[in-house]
């Protein structure tokens, strides 16, 4: 099953001609999940030909303008594409007020259901039979959340040789075993799925962290992520400035990635003081701590692969 992340915008504070504000879209087959909705999100969705009609849920980190001002336009646009499914908007306190006020002031025409969920306590905020999204507190100048999208374990691989050895003929009985059901073999014995299936296999994990001072505890929340998107707003040596503004340097983000043993980290939410050519400084500093670091770029996409 395909799982990929699209960087819709990688900038922080203000948009630049070549850099939209922070927004990341995760696509799992036909389902879309948006993490933050900065200014320029609609433009990026159009350029990437992504079907915003299929966005299931939008997860907002906090209500600073550079993370949420793209939301009203996206809500209005969704009324123009015959959306039928409800849209979930999930975030910390003030998200519901922002959505409701925007609808009133802009006199929005909305022809689909919007379900807003404000997070009061960290934990699971969205789930299906195959995956869940968890939230956890960050430390910024207003209530701010990080998120992890994690698939549940998959069944182990089916062992046809084991099935044959247990006198289970090829056909519908094999399918039942793979579906988690017991069957009766040709010689009348009860065969359990675990008799012919290998160990369960790990699902994939995506984590999104932006706008927070350095917290070592973040590493536990994003542990073993396949793809970790994390703010790296400033270069090494600016730790004091970052702490005062409740942001992180690129090396602090890299330390979290290292401690969490993630597979790959993409820096995001760059300070507008850095041009694209100057971002290499952030990359070089981060790679001193965590070599598997890349720079987010607008319209970049990353495939998340299964381990096996």
Swiss-Prot record:
Name the catalysed reactions. Answer: Endonucleolytic cleavage of RNA, removing extra 3' nucleotides from tRNA precursor, generating 3' termini of tRNAs. A 3'-hydroxy group is left at the tRNA terminus and a 5'-phosphoryl group is left at the trailer molecule
So where does Zn(2+) 1 get bound?
62, 64, 140, 211
- Which Gene3D superfamilies did the record assign? Ribonuclease Z/Hydroxyacylglutathione hydrolase-like (3.60.15.10)
Q: Which Pfam families match?
A: Lactamase_B, Lactamase_B_2
Q: Catalytic residues per the record?
A: 66 (proton acceptor)
What does the record give as EC number? 3.1.26.11
What's noted on cofactor binding?
A: Binds 2 Zn(2+) ions.
Query: A single Gene Ontology molecular function, please?
Result: zinc ion binding
Q: Tell me the enzyme class.
A: hydrolase
State the needed cofactors, names only. Answer: Zn(2+)
User: What SUPFAM superfamilies is this protein classified in?
Assistant: Metallo-hydrolase/oxidoreductase (SSF56281)
Q: Which residues cross the membrane?
A: none
Keyword entries, A-Z: Endonuclease, Hydrolase, Metal-binding, Nuclease, tRNA processing, Zinc
Q: Which InterPro entries match?
A: Metallo-B-lactamas, RibonucZ/Hydroxyglut_hydro, RNase_Z/BN
Q: Which annotated residues bind Zn(2+) 2?
A: 66-67, 211, 269
Q: What highest taxon heads this organism's lineage?
A: Bacteria
Q: What does this gene product do?
A: Zinc phosphodiesterase, which displays some tRNA 3'-processing endonuclease activity. Probably involved in tRNA maturation, by removing a 3'-trailer from precursor tRNA.
Q: Which family does it belong to?
A: Belongs to the RNase Z family.
Q: How does it assemble?
A: Homodimer.
Q: Which PANTHER family match?
A: ZINC PHOSPHODIESTERASE ELAC PROTEIN 1
In Swiss-Prot or TrEMBL terms, this protein is called: Ribonuclease Z
């Amino acid at each position: 099953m395909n799982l990929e992340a699209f960087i819709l915008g990688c900038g922080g504070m203000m948009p630049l001609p070549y850099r939209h504000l922070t927004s990341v879209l995760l696509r799992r087959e036909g389902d879309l999940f948006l993490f933050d909705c900065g200014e320029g999100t609609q433009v990026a969705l159009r350029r990437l030909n992504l079907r915003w009609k299929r966005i299931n849920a939008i997860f907002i980190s906090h209500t600073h303008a550079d993370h949420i001002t793209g939301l009203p336009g996206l809500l209005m646009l969704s009324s123009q594409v015959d959306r039928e499914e409800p849209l979930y908007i999930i975030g910390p306190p003030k998200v519901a007020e922002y959505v409701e006020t925007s609808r009133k002031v802009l006199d929005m025409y909305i022809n689909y259901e919007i379900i807003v969920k404000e997070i009061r306590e960290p934990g699971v905020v969205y789930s299906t039979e195959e995956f869940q999204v968890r939230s956890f507190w960050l430390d910024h100048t207003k209530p701010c959340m990080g998120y992890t999208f994690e698939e549940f374990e998959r069944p182990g691989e089916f062992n046809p040789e084991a099935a044959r050895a247990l006198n289970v003929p090829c056909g519908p009985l094999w399918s039942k075993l793979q579906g988690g059901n017991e069957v009766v073999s040709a010689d009348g014995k009860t065969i359990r799925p675990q008799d012919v299936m290998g160990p369960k296999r790990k699902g994939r994990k995506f984590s999104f962290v932006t706008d927070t001072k350095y917290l070592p505890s973040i590493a536990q929340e994003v542990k073993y992520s396949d793809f970790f998107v994390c703010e790296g707003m400033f270069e090494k040596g600016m730790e004091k400035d970052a702490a005062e503004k409740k942001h992180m340097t690129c090396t602090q983000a890299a330390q979290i990635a290292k401690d969490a043993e993630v597979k790959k980290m993409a820096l995001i939410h760059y300070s507008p003081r850095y041009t694209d050519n100057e971002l290499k400084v952030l990359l070089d500093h981060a790679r001193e701590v965590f070599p598997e670091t890349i720079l987010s770029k607008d319209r970049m996409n990353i495939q998340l692969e299964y381990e096996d």
